Every structure is written in C-alpha cells, then in structure tokens.
Design a protein with these regions (language model features):
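Conserved AdoMet
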Residues: 1-30
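A secondary-structure boundary/capping signal
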Residues: 11-12, 85, 161
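Proline-centered helix-kink/hinge sites
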Residues: 17, 105-106, 125, 153
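Class I S-adenosylmethionine-dependent transferase superfamily signal
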Residues: 50, 120, 143-147
Length: 171
C-alpha cells in the first residue's frame, strides 16, 4: 500500500495506513527533533516516513512480533534505519529519552465494534484497533506518564485519538 510516498507491505498483523496518519506525519515533520519514538508501530509507516524525511534517530515499539517483522521489512525496502523493539507499552517502565513520541494506539471502543466496516474487521488486527470500554484512555495515560521522564526538555507527544474522548485525552 502507499503511505506518504512510500511503498509498504501490510497484512493481517498491521493496520492499513490511512490519510489521517499522513496528516499526523505532516504535523510532526514541522517540528525540530533529533530522536523520535513511535509506540504501536504496526507496519512501521510513521517511523519510516520520519526516517525518510529527517536525519533523526527513530525508534519504534510494538507488542506484536508479527507486526514488527513487517515493519522491519518495510524499513529495509524503503532504505531507512530504525531501531525496532518488541515491547508491551502497558508493561513498560522505561524508555530511551527522545524529543518526540508519537502513537496511534488502540482507541475504538469494544462496544463500537459493530459499527466498524467489515473490511476493517476482516483484514486488520483487533489488537491494534480496540480498547476496553471500561478503560478507553489506558494507552494515552500510560504513554503520558512515561513521557514525563523520557521526553527531553521541550519534547512533544503526538497522538491519533478517538474524537469521542478528545477532551479527556487532552486532560
């Protein structure tokens, strides 16, 4: 599939990159940063685009080893160097210090599953899409708490969010 002028392989272990994510990359590329971390990298689309368009050191984390294999292949095919790390962010207490953290974590509520198009459910991993209704901000809260200690001074967080929880996510 195409993303930000790149050719990427996707499969049932990765989300299919969407235009909203390209817009997120546009915003990030306006920033000055030396080191960036993508949490929940999936196909690697975000860190690959960042590595292709900057000289920054780029790291990427995912809980899925299968997704990381695809991300590594995509990085190689697009001739960029990224440090991929197999890690469950919810079980993590330390990260490398970076200037920028980006994440498109699971944010669709389990109760919204029936509203999701069948082609999404058929071809994309539920692990990357859905979050429990009782704790919809779990990933944002964890990443924000890690950012306190592992974002460099003047560092920034970039998230894709569920519009339903926009205000709560900001808080």
């Amino acid at each position: 599939t195409g993303f930000y002028g790149l050719k990427l392989k996707v499969n049932e272990h990765t989300l299919i990159p969407r235009p909203d994510t390209e817009q997120l990359v546009d915003w990030i590329l306006k920033e000055n940063f030396v080191a960036a971390l993508d949490i929940g990298t999936g196909s690697g689309c975000i860190p690959i685009a960042l590595a292709k368009h900057t000289d920054a050191k780029v790291l990427a984390i995912d809980v899925s080893e299968d997704a990381l294999l695809i991300a590594e292949e995509n990085a190689k095919n697009n001739e960029v160097e990224i440090d991929f790390i197999h890690q469950d962010i919810l079980q993590t207490n330390s990260l490398q210090k970076v200037d920028l953290i980006v994440s498109n974590p699971p944010y669709v509520l389990e109760s919204e599953k029936e509203k999701i198009q069948e082609n999404v459910l058929d071809y994309e991993p539920e692990l990357a899409l859905f979050v429990e209704d009782k704790n919809p901000l779990i990933f944002y809260k964890k990443i924000a708490s890690l950012a306190i200690n592992f974002l460099n001074e003047n560092g920034k967080l970039f998230f894709e969010i569920n519009a339903k929880f926009g205000k709560e996510t900001i808080e």
